[in-house]
Amino acid sequence: MPRGEVDMEAQAESALKGSVRLGSYLRRLRVGYGYSLRRVEERAKAEGGEIDNSQLSRYEKGICYPSFDKLRVLASVFNVSVQAFSDVVDLEACEVLKAQGAEPKALVDEGNAAMKAGAYRQAFAYYDFALDQLHSDDSFPNAQDAMTQTRINLAVALSRLGKLALAEQELRHALRASNTLSPTLVARAFLALSNIHADQGDLLLSEVEADKALNLAKAAGLNLLAARALQTLGRVLAQNKEHSAAIDRYREAVTLYETCGEQFETVRVRINVGDCYVALGKMKEGVRLIRSALADARTAGYRRLEAQAWSNLGEAHFRAGETDQAQSCLRQSDALAGSPEKYPDILFFNAYYEWKMAGNQGNPTREKIAFGRLKALRSSLERRLPEVEAFDAFVERRRSDG
């Protein structure tokens, strides 16, 4: 059964009433298209489904859940994925994290701090509440720009949570008014889109969008945004296995980050540079750089980056045939990535290399446990990691052979 169907049915079974968040999302989609309730009913019929306007009204009010078949029809009407609906319901758990009584700017500042701490659900809740306030009261200074800025931040938080379809939708919504937006906001939106498309494996589109963001940032003298665009271009090059060129881009980014006093991204880029050196066969230098970045991430309290650095060290030792060191590093990463907020992509990465090592050592019990973890984590990943693609290919081969 598809993950979206499982999630929606689980939600329907766990509550007698519907989802207020899903209802609000459906209403935003309908209003965004300029559709009346009756018009949605007509479009549903054109898509081969049946949703009368009274049903949709109940869905929007959070009175009841749509069936999975109804969600399929609504997804076609509004040109979104069923997965997006599932993700919206999943995010309902973030409602309890919303702060009360704060101004939008303070909420956004809290969200930014939560992002750096790796608390992505908390960050999402702050941004979402700030966006609600800005929507309900346009008397705030520069309300339109503030709304777009917050929407971009919200999209970045969604992408960190693995909700790529929802994140992309928020960014495309932000860019609808690109003619009236400042170069800073347009560049930020394109850069966020670029990273989402890199996560999805569309490296050509990602490169085009990052280049556009870089040109806008340079023209406006926005060094921090230019650094982020260079970092994304380095990422695209690394994913294309052009590691030497990626290092050059990363170093340009670090130079700009340091002039801006941006420590968090500097640490992230240093991890990536170390990873590139390992990929080039320069193990000693790569490990040195990653360990140096790891120490700074730990000191600064950047839990996500610390977990990432341990994972990259684990992979480096695995490729060098140093199994004990690899396992030790991956365990350190698991401890950080498993709580208080889980990072499924890092946990999957770690489980993949545990699975490979168990197979190499002829340990069927450990291999089976790691494989079970991979299967459990796979359903929560939209991001197209090389390890995800290798695992999917293995599963498909086994299915074909069976």
Which ranges hold each PLM region?
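DNA major-groove recognition helix of helix-turn-helix/homeodomain DNA-binding modules
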Residues: 63, 67-84, 397-402
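Tandem amphipathic alpha-helical repeat scaffolds
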Residues: 105-120, 146-162, 185-201, 224-241, ...
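A short, Lys/Arg-rich alpha-helix, primarily the initiator
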Residues: 2-35
